Amino acid sequence: VTNTLTWNAANTPSLLLLPPGASGEVRFSINVRRDYPIKRLGDKNFTLKVDAEIDSPTVPYFLAAQKTVGVAALQTQVAGLVSVNALAYFRDAASGILNAGPIPPKVNTPTNYTIHWVVKNYSTDVRDAEVRAFLQSGVRWTGKVKSNIAAVPSYNERTQEVVWPIGKIIATKGVINKPLEAIFQIEATPSVDQTNRYMPLLSETAVTAFDEFINAELRGADAEISTLTIDDPTVSPDNRMVKP
């Protein structure tokens, strides 16, 4: 495999004869990998490079050459990727935060859940990284929070928004080594009109960061969380709907 594409007069008739000053173009597209070839900490700042060359046997009379040749090169920087995974648990002793309340959830009775935000950064260094989500109606912030970095999530009671201001994340963080993780506890109290329904807990979780390699903003997200979609394997599907 030479990774070479060739155009000539046989497949591109316009190349058969080019008058002086003439111009033209050929186009092609390629598929790139769906993942980054990251195997060690230094694997970052990937680029796609194309070298182009055109030659002709026509040589000006004043040149002593076999052919005329023109060359050009194009190099494209590959954007990075920052991802967030939002998880929810009822039984979560490993986090160091103990939850209480009825399972299945019960009308007008509070049940605690722990929310985990797991962040990975792939092929570029990023700065100003931040994770955001909103608590849903009937959900309260308990104030129990922790993370494996200095910054922890904070809560705006007026807007019901939770924000985790991470800051700078080096490339391959969470891919080669342990990801960034924050944990906070919420208290959900279902209302009467949620009887025999699944209670929404957390809105879509969004992560943003500035890619220092391509000088552009990166965005990622994970789906909203309800009592139906919690990730706790100890809570069966039959015990996730709100009961009277």
What are these regions (language model features)?
Residues 8-46, 51-60, 116-120, 165-214:
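Low-complexity, intrinsically disordered segments enriched in Ser/Thr together with acidic residues
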Residues 96-133:
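Short beta-strand elements of extracellular/lumenal beta-sandwich folds
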Residues 38-100, 140-151, 195, 199-244:
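Extracellular/luminal low-complexity Ser/Thr/Pro-rich, glycosylation-prone repeat/linker regions
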Residues 23-27, 71-73, 110-114, 128-130, ...:
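Intrinsic-disorder/low-complexity, polar/charged segments enriched in Ser/Thr/Lys/Arg/Asp/Glu/Gln
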Residues 19-23, 41-45, 69, 77-79, ...:
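Surface-exposed coil/turn segments at beta-strand junctions on protein surfaces, enriched
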Residues 21, 110-113, 137-140, 217-218:
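Gram-negative and organellar
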Residues 1-17, 86-93, 128-172, 223, ...:
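A surface/secretory-pathway sequence property marking extracellular, secreted
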